[in-house]
């Protein structure tokens, strides 16, 4: 499978075209909209979330609730577009007009300056509109389609926030069902009820100070069969693809799988997961320090991926920058933004991980229809249990 997204933060809509989804997959628009609503929640979101009520429209590839095998077109309209029609118009406008609203002061930590230089743009709005994290809206919609495919095979996904700024949640061993239920009730998507109010207070203080906060999120995938991905070529390793997917999320600066960077300070005997076998489940591991991936392939254990999000670069008390017209120092430009988007980013992380796992399933079990894919998966799972 593959997909492309298009659209700007303040343009009329965000669009995704997905190709390669098997036919006869039941698609629920309500479930896609539920994921979009999850992305809009979270303590620390900005005023724009009071404007946007994201809802998906499916323009192709789904008929009467089922995929047809044709490309699927997803659209999410930007309600805020009504206030930006002149500024974001595709029609020419006069230089110096209000509609131009040119941006010449790049924000530290954003794509503004690098993109302007690369694409020969003197107006950095042409960069910031596309590089905005608003683009993740339609990626969550894409991920919601992937989740519905995975659900057909009993593969489930959950996520949580582990850290916001200096506040680190205490790790808790809970079932995926409990994790999903409890994080949905948390304004910061955190299991630790003691850390939750501290995180919220830190976000409020950052907002008061005109600053922003980052953090760490974790995604867990259960029910994944053994052998997704491959060891034979670098670009087919599933852990590499998952790392790229997480790092593709705006403002993410780090990723780890399983115990990740902790492994650097441990001995091999403390890192590797011992293999066990029984008649009911076949091969398994005593522990899951590898995070469900070894040699670029899934082990059958839960896939565990974490990502680090830096503080959002748009600050209401901006850092110093340089105006590209005068080359004089100025405070960087200000765009409406969140003070902390880590809870929302955990939903985005779930979406991009869902896509990669679903894509790996389609590669392992290539089928034009869901019916054929289900039979292929059934036979493979029976084979792995008897291996």
Curated annotation (Swiss-Prot):
Catalytically driven reaction(s): 5-O-(1-carboxyvinyl)-3-phosphoshikimate = chorismate + phosphate
Using the record for this protein, list the coiled-coil segments as residue ranges, or answer none: none
Annotated region (Disordered) at 92-113
Q: In terms of domain of life, where is this protein from?
A: Bacteria
Q: Which GO terms describe its cellular component?
A: cytosol
Task: Specify whether Amino-acid biosynthesis is a keyword of the entry.
Answer: yes
The SS bond pairs are none
Q: Which Pfam families match?
A: Chorismate_synt
Q: What is its EC class?
A: lyase
Q: How is the cofactor bound?
A: Reduced FMN (FMNH(2)).
Which cofactors must be present for this protein to function?
Answer: FMNH2
- Write out the entry's keywords from A to Z: Amino-acid biosynthesis, Aromatic amino acid biosynthesis, FAD, Flavoprotein, FMN, Lyase, NADP
A GO MF label: chorismate synthase activity
Please give the biological process terms from Gene Ontology that the record holds.
Answer: amino acid biosynthetic process; aromatic amino acid family biosynthetic process; chorismate biosynthetic process
UniProt-annotated binding residues for NADP(+): 39, 45
The keyword Methyltransferase appears for this protein: no
Q: Where does FMN bind?
A: 130-132, 250-251, 295, 310-314, 336
* Protein EC: 4.2.3.5
Q: Which CDD domains match?
A: Chorismate_synthase
In what pathway does it function? Metabolic intermediate biosynthesis; chorismate biosynthesis; chorismate from D-erythrose 4-phosphate and phosphoenolpyruvate: step 7/7
Q: Which family is annotated?
A: Belongs to the chorismate synthase family.
- Function per UniProt: This reaction introduces a second double bond into the aromatic ring system.
The protein's assembly and partners: Homotetramer.
What PANTHER family is this protein classified in?
Answer: CHORISMATE SYNTHASE (PTHR21085:SF0)
Question: What protein is this chain from?
Answer: Chorismate synthase
Which organism was this protein described from? Brevibacillus brevis (strain 47 / JCM 6285 / NBRC 100599)
């Amino acid at each position: 499978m593959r997909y492309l997204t298009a659209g700007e933060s303040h343009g009329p809509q965000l669009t995704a075209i997905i190709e390669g989804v098997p036919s006869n997959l039941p698609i629920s628009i309500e479930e896609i909209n539920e994921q979009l609503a999850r992305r809009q929640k979270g303590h620390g979101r900005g005023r724009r979330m009071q404007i946007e009520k994201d809802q998906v429209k499916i323009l192709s590839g789904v008929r009467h609730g089922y995929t047809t095998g044709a490309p699927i077109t997803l659209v999410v309209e930007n309600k805020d577009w009504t206030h930006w029609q002149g500024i974001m118009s595709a029609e020419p406008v006069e230089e110096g007009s209000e509609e131009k609203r040119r941006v010449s002061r790049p924000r530290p930590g954003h794509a503004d300056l690098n993109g302007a230089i690369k694409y020969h743009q003197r107006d950095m709005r042409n960069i910031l509109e596309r590089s905005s994290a608003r683009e993740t809206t339609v990626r969550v919609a894409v991920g919601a389609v992937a989740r519905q495919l995975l659900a057909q095979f009993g593969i489930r996904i959950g996520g949580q926030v582990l850290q916001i700024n200096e506040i680190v949640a205490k790790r808790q061993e809970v079932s995926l069902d409990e994790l999903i239920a409890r994080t949905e009730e948390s304004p910061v998507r955190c299991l630790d009820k003691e850390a939750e109010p501290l995180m919220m207070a830190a976000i409020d203080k950052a907002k008061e100070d005109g600053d922003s906060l980052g953090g760490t999120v974790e995604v867990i995938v259960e029910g994944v069969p053994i052998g997704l991905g491959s060891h034979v070529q670098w670009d087919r390793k599933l852990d590499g693809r998952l790392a790229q997917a997480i790092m593709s999320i705006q403002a993410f600066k780090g990723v780890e799988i399983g115990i990740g960077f902790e492994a650097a300070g441990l001995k091999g005997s403390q890192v590797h997961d011992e293999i066990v076998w029984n008649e009911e489940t076949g091969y398994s591991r005593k522990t899951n320090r590898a995070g469900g991936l070894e040699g670029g392939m899934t082990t059958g254990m839960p896939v565990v991926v974490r990502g680090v999000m830096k503080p959002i670069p748009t600050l209401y008390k901006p850092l110093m920058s340089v105006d590209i017209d005068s080359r004089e120092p100025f405070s960087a430009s200000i765009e409406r933004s969140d003070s902390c988007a880590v809870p929302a980013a955990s939903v985005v992380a779930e979406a991009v991980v869902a896509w990669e796992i679903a894509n790996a399933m389609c590669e392992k079990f290539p089928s034009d229809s869901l019916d054929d894919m289900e039979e292929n998966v059934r036979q493979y799972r029976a084979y792995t249990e008897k291996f």
